Amino acid sequence: MAQKLWEKSVEVNKDIERFTVGRDREMDLYLAKHDVLGSMAHITMLESIGLLTKEELAQLLTELKDIYASAERGEFVIEEGVEDVHSQVELMLTRRLGDVGKKIHSGRSRNDQVLLDLKLFTRTQIREVAEAVEQLFHVLIRQSERYKNVLMPGYTHLQIAMPSSFGLWFGAYAESLVDDMLFLQAAFKMCNKNPLGSAAGYGSSFPLNRTMTTELLGFDSLNYNVVYAQMGRGKMERNVAFALATLAGTISKLAFDACIFNSQNFGFVKLPDECTTGSSIMPHKKNPDVFELTRAKCNKLQSLPQQIMMIANNLPSGYFRDLQIIKEVFLPAFQELKDCLQMTTYIMNEIKVNEHILDDDKYLFIFSVEEVNRLAREGMPFRDAYKKVGLDIEAGHFSHDKQVHHTHEGSIGNLCNDEISALMQRTIEGFNFQGMEQAEKTLLGRK
């Protein structure tokens, strides 16, 4: 049985140990690679201030790279009796290197270690989410251009209202993703600051070089105040969760639209048969389960900020074990969102559009505003034109050629997709993922 890093002479009650460890061994597997990267930067700094010899550093780096590779292969495990990933890595180093392995924790606490792991994990996941969003964005813009001349009804209060187009529909969700990415970018900038060196939350008497570890890990800056570095635990996760929830809100709305538009009562779009499921009793059914589940998963993700807020609510400054529970809802959320983005991207690329929706006379009245505007352009006061068209509708005399003449920015005839694409490109460039990627490659000795 492995000893705990804090092992005392009194044996802890087994039920207490089980309860306090909780799901940490499971959750910390998400953090294994990042814990190793943090340790590599930390020991490189320790050698620079004389707490490790060059030979000891070389030995530790060799073993840490080996542990990193095992985590990459999915072979890293946290043994029974070992509390967390930090303890497991130190245990492995001590088994392999003896006393040299015991030196790795100098100037460090599990408090700043887990905070560092979370930040390294989170910024990597934000990059992957951003890449998935960008892929969906390009599909939506492409479909917007492809179907820009196909009209569809626009709705207010779920009543037919005015002409819209599939160009507008696809493009609207593309532009929504641009704004969502601004939230994600803000979360990334907050996350991309180095907490290492704050130790238990009050710094260290070792002459740590925090600027060095900041550069080694590719952070933009560091959390300067060591007390605030620890106060950021919970706050960082909550703000990232808000960004994920914002994206989830867009995807949930898109999924809802797709479910409605795919139904026989609307018939605006058709999902590929291979993307639908059937019924055990009704042989004709082709259910949009993929979008129903996407909607549910995204609605669940929208509750994430509140869950984190309630766990961390009313905590004073300093570290508290309450924060451990946040990992259980926070760490898996990224994969859930990426799955939803991947499914949505695939379906949006394959979806078929009904190009003759407005041939149905039940949609005739959506052109009433077009007629009002035509009369107004010819000189009739708008309110008089409004009343005339209203009376024509009531009398059953209204007719229209079903043509639209919208030319202003962002309208049916002028989608501004190039401008929206430029906004997305500038937003993506603002993340500056290159710094973190290069730092990680350098630490691992990879090109």
Curated annotation (Swiss-Prot):
Pfam family, one: Lyase_1
GO molecular function per UniProt: argininosuccinate lyase activity
One of the GO biological process terms: arginine biosynthetic process via ornithine
Main location: cytoplasm
PROSITE patterns, alphabetized: FUMARATE_LYASES
Documented EC number(s): 4.3.2.1
Catalysis: reaction(s): 2-(N(omega)-L-arginino)succinate = fumarate + L-arginine
GO cellular component: cytosol
Top-rank taxon: Bacteria
Pathway: Amino-acid biosynthesis; L-arginine biosynthesis; L-arginine from L-ornithine and carbamoyl phosphate: step 3/3
NCBIfam families, alphabetized: argH
Family: Belongs to the lyase 1 family. Argininosuccinate lyase subfamily.
Protein's UniProt name: Argininosuccinate lyase
Organism of provenance: Bacteroides fragilis (strain ATCC 25285 / DSM 2151 / CCUG 4856 / JCM 11019 / LMG 10263 / NCTC 9343 / Onslow / VPI 2553 / EN-2)
